[in-house]
Amino acid sequence: MIQNEKKHLILYTGDVTKNLKSGIWNASRIKSNLELVKALENVKLTKFTGDGDENLKKNIKVLVPVNEKPQKLDGKQEEYEIIVKLFFLDGENIDIKKREETLSQVFYNLHMLFGIDFVSTLVVSFPHITFLKESGNSSSNEIYDSIDEIPPQEIQSWVDTWKLLEEKVGEGKIGTLGVSEFGVNELQRLISSVNVVPESTQINIGQNCKLPNDLLNFADRHHLKLFFHSDPSALLSESEITSVIHKACPEIPNPARVDWVIRYTILTRHTAVIHQKGYIVQSTYTE
């Protein structure tokens, strides 16, 4: 066996609306990953061995809940509103080629698990960016204090990644695009360089009660929708994912890191009731 060989592991939480106990939903404005962490801690995972699974051919292990095997959506996909938030957690080594592979993995796994081929809205979260700069960010997850601190190559990575998303829009796989934690400066840099502009930005303003006027005016001029959210920039830490993997796969002793996370929310279109909500996480470890 090759020493220090990198391996990938995909974890599927199942429907968190069924698995989570009441009272742990984060309805406040305080950033928290409690929903995801509890979902991973509370679920018993087993290896998925679906027929024709391309992950198996790539030697990627997939773990799914023991008592909730993936099922295709009931009825036609047009009956559902499917919202996906994609968290890129590759801040230490941003690689556009790998992000392209991530997008392929995301759509492949959505199809494999649920038969989903079209996402109504995809919101992307980039590393190192937070709207509220003084919100007490962890030193383990570098956050830039201003747009001037962001290296030009990282800003270019937003644009290059966005162009990959634009291709998915052109292919009919995504309806609309949104961003997370982008303020006016970040939005200006992005919008000036892309063809498909974001239709929304998700921000966290902490305990503040009022949105900045410059953002309100910018959103009005560019027809942007503004949404509040409570997701931390680093959605899942190395220690958190390592603990989950050790529990599910004791044979994997080494630390793991998270490559990307998606949260999917599937709404019944005519009633706006949540049909399913869950997370898919890809991590990397070495053998």
Swiss-Prot record:
Q: Which GO terms describe its biological process?
A: cellular detoxification; cysteine metabolic process; glutathione biosynthetic process
Q: What does the record give under GO molecular function?
A: glutamate-cysteine ligase catalytic subunit binding; glutamate-cysteine ligase regulator activity
Subcellular compartments: Cytoplasm
Key words, A-Z = Cytoplasm, Glutathione biosynthesis
One GO cellular component assignment for this chain's record is:
glutamate-cysteine ligase complex
- Pathway annotation: Sulfur metabolism; glutathione biosynthesis; glutathione from L-cysteine and L-glutamate: step 1/2
Which superkingdom does the taxonomy of this entry point to?
Eukaryota
Entry's family note = Belongs to the aldo/keto reductase family. Glutamate--cysteine ligase light chain subfamily.
The record describes its quaternary structure and partners as: Heterodimer of a catalytic heavy chain and a regulatory light chain.
Official protein name in the record:
Putative glutamate--cysteine ligase regulatory subunit
